[in-house]
Amino acid sequence: ELKEQVVFVSGQVEKPGSIPLVGTYITVFEAINKSGGLGPLAWPSRTKLIRIENGVKSIIKVNIKKIRKGERSLDVILKPDDMIVVPEAIF
């Protein structure tokens, strides 16, 4: 039985949880939108993508603030089991 391929979105988004990867690819920005968008306390410029490949964990910074302003080249295509963390802004 094939395990459903998903990515996980946590932290300051409206609906944290898993998002299925169906057919086409999805980016960090799109996954956040599918999670209801950024929460009121989000710090989008400090968003992190946590990826484990071959047992090696890497943390990739993804500046959602710049991507929202049109710098689409900064967005990252997600792989199964990727975890997106949107931190809370510190005031």
Give a label for each model feature:
Residues E1-F91:
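Ser/Thr/Pro/Gly-biased, low-complexity, turn-/loop-rich segments
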